[in-house]
Amino acid sequence: MMTYIVFILSVIFVIGFVGFSSKPSPIYGGLVLIVSGGVGCGIIMNFGGSFLGLMVFLIYLGGMLVVFGYTTAMATEQYPEVWVSNATVMGVFLLGLLMEVMLVLYVLKSEEVGVVFKFSSVGHWAIYDIGNSGVFSEEIMGVAALYSYGAWVVVVTGWSLLVGVLVILEVTRGD
Amino acid sequence: MNPLILTIILMTVFLGTMIVMASSHWLMIWIGFEMNLLAIIPILMKKYNPRAMEASTKYFLTQATASMLLMMAIIINLMHSGQWTITKVFNPTASIIMTLALAMKLGLTPFHFWVPEVTQGISLTSGLILLTWQKLAPMSILYQISPSINLNILLTMAVLSILVGGWGGLNQTQLRKIMAYSSIAHMGWMAAILVYNPTLTMLNMLIYIMMTLTMFMLFIHSSSTTTLSLSHTWNKAPLITTLILITLLSMGGLPPLSGFMPKWMIIQELTKNSSIILPTLMAIMALLNLYFYMRLTYSTSLTMFPSTNNMKMKWQFETKQITLLPPLIIASSLLLPLTPMLSILD
């Protein structure tokens, strides 16, 4: 089972996404997002990215989802919709599950499509690389590269986040 | 809107498009598209009525879907070529998905359904930004991947866009919807020549932006959003009436006005590549476009459209100043003799 752990985790990931895409009440969507976030963290950690997995738990689940949970708890209605309360929601959820099951069967049975075990590195294309030393983990080097060679990306993403906050404030102001 | 916030947001729209046009890394291009989309939403929602909210939501959903398709194409390209630089996209799957994603962003058929509805729901100035500036970024990416685009898909979408742009605009009286369908048709012309000679795509984009800017400025000057209110301009500013006539005929592609230049060059390039039926069909379908432009000029400049008597004696308010209208008029009608200067666009 351990060789297929990434596959199993990604199937649970997709089922989680189907769960909140079928639009139950946002509280239940947040619940499923917690599960999906945890499972996504597991997928990243299986490729050696322990730092990024920790970031997912801390920032995404512990920061953004907590704020989301509090705001939806303030704005929730008296009888929130669950997956089984509404025929439409249940239908979409079951349809998504069916598609996922068919995809899993196709991947497991067919000879052409396989399961990804390991990503091959970018070889000599990368300008910031540690080679095959095996001492440093690649993802920590990636984070370090972001703040040295990739400073422009940090500037652009920081600016996007600032503008995102301004846009949201502007849109919800209503006037 | 607070002037500081408006400045920051407009700057971010500009920055987003600039990042898309100047980047060599696919991820930065995607970031540029998202930044552009995020920052234009409050501009579309300037008036807080439900129509504008609905239009902004539709725009956001379609453009976000297109960005997701673009990201998938980028990742497939990464998987097969192992690198992130913008070059010819070698994998056919990635190329097709990327073409479809960029067609969604531009509003080519069969992804054109959002263009009239979004353009109608927002104010004239926002519609101006939507139909001119927002087309620059996806077109620049199409230009850069043009050697690897699947010809069948792109030409099908182009011809269908010209047809839909002409046919769909026939029953419209709202000026913003007319401009939206005109935009769909022009994007079709641009996409048709992209694989054969991308320089002409850029020429068509340039002339189209100048003509659309002129039309929108004239509409903003007379504050008219329907054919009926446009037909009252003879009373408010008779010169605007003449300018509307000239610009609309230029948009229809009539010589000796500058709107003829891109169509002429495109048809010439297509025939040089031994396709005769296609440019004939495209030219015939451009007649549909010309029909509803002519109908606008008929009701505005050539006749005094029937109206109630109190519309015939309008109080003269202070005239709005429009940016750059004289140069735009000149550019959108008199550029045809400059056709040999095409070589500077290479």
From Swiss-Prot, chain A:
Q: Which InterPro entries match?
A: ComplexI_Subunit6 (IPR050269), NADH_UbQ/plastoQ_OxRdtase_su6 (IPR001457), Nuo/plastoQ_OxRdtase_6_NuoJ (IPR042106)
- Translocase as a keyword of this entry, yes or no, is yes
Listed A to Z, the keywords are:
Electron transport, Membrane, Mitochondrion, Mitochondrion inner membrane, NAD, Respiratory chain, Translocase, Transmembrane, Transmembrane helix, Transport, Ubiquinone
Q: What superkingdom does the record give?
A: Eukaryota
Give the GO molecular function terms: NADH dehydrogenase (ubiquinone) activity
One GO cellular component term of this record is: mitochondrial inner membrane
Single Gene Ontology BP term? mitochondrial respiratory chain complex I assembly
Q: Where in the cell is it found?
A: Mitochondrion inner membrane
Q: What is its EC number?
A: 7.1.1.2
Q: Which Pfam families match?
A: Oxidored_q3
Q: Which residues cross the membrane?
A: 1-21, 25-45, 47-67, 88-108, 149-169
What kind of membrane protein is this, topologically? Answer: Multi-pass membrane protein
Name the predominant localization. mitochondrion
- Enzyme class per UniProt: translocase
Can you state the subunit structure given in the record? Core subunit of respiratory chain NADH dehydrogenase (Complex I) which is composed of 45 different subunits.
Q: What does this protein do?
A: Core subunit of the mitochondrial membrane respiratory chain NADH dehydrogenase (Complex I) which catalyzes electron transfer from NADH through the respiratory chain, using ubiquinone as an electron acceptor. Essential for the catalytic activity and assembly of complex I.
Q: Family per UniProt?
A: Belongs to the complex I subunit 6 family.
Protein name, UniProt field: NADH-ubiquinone oxidoreductase chain 6
Q: What is the originating organism of this protein?
A: Equus asinus
UniProtKB/Swiss-Prot annotation, chain B:
Source organism per UniProt = Equus asinus
Q: Any idea which UniProt keywords this protein has?
A: Electron transport, Membrane, Mitochondrion, Mitochondrion inner membrane, NAD, Respiratory chain, Translocase, Transmembrane, Transmembrane helix, Transport, Ubiquinone
Q: What is the lineage of its organism?
A: Eukaryota, Metazoa, Chordata, Craniata, Vertebrata
Q: Is Transport there in the keyword field?
A: yes
Biological process terms from the Gene Ontology for this record are: mitochondrial electron transport, NADH to ubiquinone; mitochondrial respiratory chain complex I assembly
Bilayer-spanning residue ranges: 3-23, 25-45, 59-79, 96-116, 122-142, 149-169, 178-198, 200-220, 237-257, 274-294, 322-342
- Catalytic reaction list: a ubiquinone + NADH + 5 H(+)(in) = a ubiquinol + NAD(+) + 4 H(+)(out)
Name the Enzyme Commission number(s) assigned to this protein: 7.1.1.2
- The gene behind this protein is MT-ND2
Cite the record's note on assembly.
Core subunit of respiratory chain NADH dehydrogenase (Complex I) which is composed of 45 different subunits. Interacts with TMEM242.
What one GO molecular function would you report for this record?
NADH dehydrogenase (ubiquinone) activity
- Please tell me one Gene Ontology term that the record gives under cellular component: mitochondrial inner membrane
Which InterPro entries does the record associate with it? Complex_I_Subunit_2, NADH_DH_su2_C, NADH_UbQ_OxRdtase_chain2, ND/Mrp_TM
**In which domain of life is the source organism classified?**
Eukaryota
- The answer to keyword Translocase applying to this record is yes
Full protein name: NADH-ubiquinone oxidoreductase chain 2
The entry's localization annotation reads: Mitochondrion inner membrane
